[in-house]
Structures are given as C-alpha cells and as structure tokens.
C-alpha cells in the first residue's frame, strides 16, 4: 500500500526553488500497543492518585516520553528503595523479576504492573517449561541481549540457574547443556526477526528435542516495523530511524535497514540530534520510528525537512495495526 503527497513550502521571494527530496515513510512505525498501554498506566495513575507517581525504570526507552511524564509528576527510579513507604509505583513495560513485586508487597506499596502483555506471555512460557522444578522441568535457553531490562525481568521469573542466556549465533553453536534432551527456548520480544531465526535454527539442529513457544515470541510490532523498513530500504539512500540508543527495537530497525539495501542507516533520537550534513547527496530518504518513539517526533522531522526541501512523501504501509491492550488491575475499568 502506498500513498503519495507533495509537501512544499510556498516561495514568493524569488529565491531558487528547493531541491526535491523523496521521503518514504515506513508503516507501521512508532508506538505499539504495549508502549501505549504503559504510558496510559502512568497517566491514569497520576490522574487517579495525584503526583508524584514513581516509575521503576524508564516506562519505555524514549527520553521524550519520559520527560513528558516527568513534567506531569512522574518520578523515575531504578530501585524500590527509592520509593517512600506511602508511594505509588508503576513497573515498566519491560517487566520485572518476581522479587520486585514481592518487595513491593512486603513494604505495602501500591504498585501497578505496566509489563507488556506480550512480555508477560514469555514469562508464562518460562514458568511452564520450568514446571515447578519437578521431573518435567526443562532447562531454558533465552535468546536475548545481556542486561536488557526485559531479559533481566524474564530470567528473574525463575530461580538462578534455571535459564541460560544466548546472546548470538556463536553462543548457540557452542553451548553445552547438561541434558540436551530436556531443553526449551524463549526469546526477548524486540530482537531482529532474521537473527533470531538463525539462532533458533542452530538450536533445533543441535538439539532436536528442544521445545519452543507455540507462537512466536518476537512481538507483532517488532515484526511489522522490521518488515516495513525492509520495504523501503532498497530504494533509500539513507534511512533514519527515530528512537533512543537504549531502545532495542529501534537499534534492530537500523540494522535491518542496513542489511536490506539502504546505502546508510542512522538512529536519531529526535530532530535536534540530526546532523543535516548526512543528507548531502541523498535523493530518497526513508524514515521509520521505534516502537517507543511518538509519532510527533516523525512529524517534527518531516516539517523541518519541508523547510529545506520540496518533499515528495510516500507512505509505505505493509500492515495495518488495530491492537489495544486493557489497563491492568485497579485501572482496568478506565478502558470501558
């Protein structure tokens, strides 16, 4: 699906017309349902309980979103010991280890869990394979990136030693599990679809009895955004992915663009971080945004481009999205 528009500032001052720049907008892009839900959790908590509301870790990995919520009264912390005894606290979309809500309960904190439902699905898979540590237990191999909050949260659902992290294909080739016949794998939801498929193929080849998820762990939004970037990359001299450096899915979009034929791909947090010199010689520019980047950042960039170029904009939509996740627990009624 493709829609084309021309966006050109009017010139009546005799100045030479702007150079034409073709802009391919990847679709879908930007916020996913899990991110939208997490932000709504914080906003509704602020409305219901008043400021401050504490949030453990960045609610999503985007500074613009975080700063916007801070302006409304959210306070971001890394650990629960930074939350006062009578505080209200929200857990981020990435999920948390089981010890975190247990500690919140011990301290009688009112907490709201904004973990993305698709991340919670992976948590349930891990617990199913662990099987309570009984005779049906399988050792779990988690495909993901060390230190990412989602990985920390998922591995923290089970006792130490129950899960081994697989960072890349080389680790999949060399791991030596104690019992190769009793294995299962799960994955971080924001990985490269292609990289993960390679790792899964290696694991299945080495360990034919390994069990995997009934449905793909990589979330629909990650998959759709990567497919959209693949659709624009071959025609693009440059692809700009709007997103924060600590956003896993945004980093993967940049990598996908490079691998899919773009001459160059850059991750740019927002307009003020753009080095305009990178556009020299660019005739076709692709633009996408990570799942935690608001559409306002895309429109801000397009507007700035229109001040320097005559734009021919094409929307390349590979998939329509209409998914909505309900708010958790005490806030659930606000969706009705």
Swiss-Prot record:
Its cofactor is [4Fe-4S] cluster. It catalyses: isopentenyl diphosphate + 2 oxidized [2Fe-2S]-[ferredoxin] + H2O = (2E)-4-hydroxy-3-methylbut-2-enyl diphosphate + 2 reduced [2Fe-2S]-[ferredoxin] + 2 H(+); dimethylallyl diphosphate + 2 oxidized [2Fe-2S]-[ferredoxin] + H2O = (2E)-4-hydroxy-3-methylbut-2-enyl diphosphate + 2 reduced [2Fe-2S]-[ferredoxin] + 2 H(+). [4Fe-4S] cluster binds at residues 32, 116, 219. (2E)-4-hydroxy-3-methylbut-2-enyl diphosphate binds at residues 61, 94, 148, 189, 247-249, 292. Coiled coil: none annotated. Keywords: 4Fe-4S, Iron, Iron-sulfur, Isoprene biosynthesis, Metal-binding, Oxidoreductase. GO terms for molecular function: 4 iron, 4 sulfur cluster binding; 4-hydroxy-3-methylbut-2-enyl diphosphate reductase activity; metal ion binding. Its EC number is 1.17.7.4. GO terms for biological process: dimethylallyl diphosphate biosynthetic process; isopentenyl diphosphate biosynthetic process, methylerythritol 4-phosphate pathway; terpenoid biosynthetic process. Pfam families: LYTB (PF02401). Catalyzes the conversion of 1-hydroxy-2-methyl-2-(E)-butenyl 4-diphosphate (HMBPP) into a mixture of isopentenyl diphosphate (IPP) and dimethylallyl diphosphate (DMAPP). Acts in the terminal step of the DOXP/MEP pathway for isoprenoid precursor biosynthesis. NCBIfam families: ispH_lytB (TIGR00216), PRK01045.1-4 (NF002190). This is 4-hydroxy-3-methylbut-2-enyl diphosphate reductase.
